[in-house]
Amino acid sequence: MNRIGLFILCFALFITHVKAQIHKPTESSKPIANSKPVVDSTLIANPVTLENGGKLIEFLSAETYNVKKMDSMDFLVFVGHVQIRQGKTLLFGDSLILNTTKNTLEGFGHIHINDADSVHTYADYLKYIGANKKAFLRKKVKLTDGKGILTTDSLDYDVANKIGSFIKGGKLVRDKTILTSKEGIYYGETRDVLFKKKVELHDVENRIITDTLKYNTYSQLANFSSPSKIITGSRIISTSNGNFNIGLKKSNLYDRSTVDDSTYKFVADEMNIDDSLGTGEFKGNAIYQSKDTVGFDLWAGNIKTNKLKSILFATEQPLLLIKQKKDTLYIAADTLHTGKISDLSKAIPKARDSVGKIKDTTLDKYFEAYHHVRIYSDSLQAKADSLFYSLSDSTIRLITNPIVWANENQITGDTIYLYVKNKKPEQLNVFDNAFAINKIDTTEYFNQLKGNKLNAWFENGSISKMRTKGNAENIYFALDNDKKFIGVNHSNAQIIEITFENNEPAKVIFRNQLTGNMSPIGKIPKADLKIRGFKWQETRRPKTKLDLSPNFH
């Protein structure tokens, strides 16, 4: 049909529609009973199928109809509450023009299409192709599927395959969730909507900005396949591959996503976040960076979190970095985790005093590491089976076979407490079987101090003083001003104190029950130059931070 003919027909439809409202039907404007469908056999040769194989568009009911013929084509013009069917597809409208020759349809006003399912489409204007069941809906278009409502100004809908597309902007509303985009495709079979170009999702708690997003109106699952941001309060998630279930508040993210909050930042190859429970699991080169005054990072192959309890649980070669101005403290172990001191449910050895009321909430934190603990900083290194570090009392507790190295000093005992001030070692206490060894430059000789308990004090990261009490025993190599050996002193006392200068013993003080003597080195057997239990373990000492974990590589 040419444009002039179409205009004339549409104008005639308009006049007919007006007449139907104010006059009784005339001879050319026949009333039709709603209960009795009418098909003119002189206009439609085959009441079942057309030449192109498409099913016949059948008339069901209307208030009036007109028969038109133009350009060798036949038209039925229906006005008033029109109902038409093609197979199981029902079409409704105020006015419909049926081209019986081409099996096409144009509709005006209150258009409604349903294919005997839960998907309904509405519009002010419709052009429908019966051969392939394609509907072109325009003006105030709405599509509903029982869960979501999609609105746009222009929708091309494949009724047979239940696929609709828009390219001039659209909006989907599902409960309190609103999605908008410039383009989109609706898939009725799966209830998925693929949004493209300038996509935004809003609900009560979240905002998502992306360029491509697939959303399921039933499951409320949003899938990302392009750079996307999920904004929830102060938290921003950046990802390019993953999904977010709006209803369940669960995210599964891949391809090195990032979580950035006001107090922390997370990066990992894969993330599984459950906001309903406040939990998360971060897999593959996971990095947690705190933004509070504590200032620590946690690296691991796997990190589990509980935001409500402020818990981090790291496995797969975890590494903890406690940041300092000039000297970061690195801690590695088989397992590392952190939580609140105030939430501890069971006693930690010697740590009950840490569970009291803590005024500064940033200090209400502990770090625990167990099995194969290794520590490295420029000024101090250590190893133990387990570690407990409380920020509330600034104490690092090394438990089970602990050993500490500081410059040329090695210290061992049953349990070692390291007290930290401003993130630097301030004091060290050794409980039971304390043994300190100091290597003398490049020689084969060692100063030694042994006792029941031992205390050491630090200045600027170096040991300035040692004191042992209870069955104290000491071997000390005396040097002259030219660093030449004068002799060796082997003594016992109740208390022995050693002061250090330039990381070397400078003065020894004995208190109570002193016994011992000074002898030339050459007159003492080598076996007697070492206190019983002597064990120099320099080969176990971490030389650099690279010795702690493969994560550094």
What do the predicted segments below correspond to?
Residues 1-29:
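Bacterial Sec-dependent N-terminal signal peptides
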